[in-house]
UniProtKB/Swiss-Prot annotation:
The keyword Ribosomal protein applies. Belongs to the bacterial ribosomal protein bL19 family. GO terms for molecular function: structural constituent of ribosome. This is Large ribosomal subunit protein bL19. This protein is located at the 30S-50S ribosomal subunit interface and may play a role in the structure and function of the aminoacyl-tRNA binding site. The keyword Magnesium does not apply. It comes from the Bacteria. PANTHER family: LARGE RIBOSOMAL SUBUNIT PROTEIN BL19M (PTHR15680:SF9), RIBOSOMAL PROTEIN L19 (PTHR15680). InterPro entries: Ribosomal_bL19, Ribosomal_bL19_CS, Ribosomal_bL19_sf, Translation_prot_SH3-like_sf. One of its GO terms (cellular component) is cytosolic large ribosomal subunit. Residues 123-133 have a biased composition (Basic and acidic residues).
Amino acid sequence: MNVIEQLRKEEADRLLAQRKVPEFRPGDTVRVNVRIKEGDRERVQAYEGVCIARAGQGVDENFTVRKISFGEGVERVFPILSPMIESIEVKRRGVVRRAKLYYLRDRRGKSARIAERQMTAASKEEPAEKSEA
């Protein structure tokens, strides 16, 4: 591992220790609370939509959220470790078989829906077991 990769890994570990980032995948509906500066004031705005992609790794990791606002599709790319993100909440888990859901851009109405992933008791316990090991 070269020096730059080592520095990026250390920085990502440091930032992840400070901030709690939930585990989510493309297809999940997420609410991202973003800090917005307007002049000398700062407020928090919620942006809720479907995560259609995750890209990068470490410090450079980002995700794309798509929502429909007044009949128009709006997409926004957020860096996971951005200081402008106050929190990320997973509202719904979706069942998809793709890592990138760009095909949703061409879909309208019911065909753009994503089925909800059913959480069983075994799948809820599984992540806890992985973190202990």
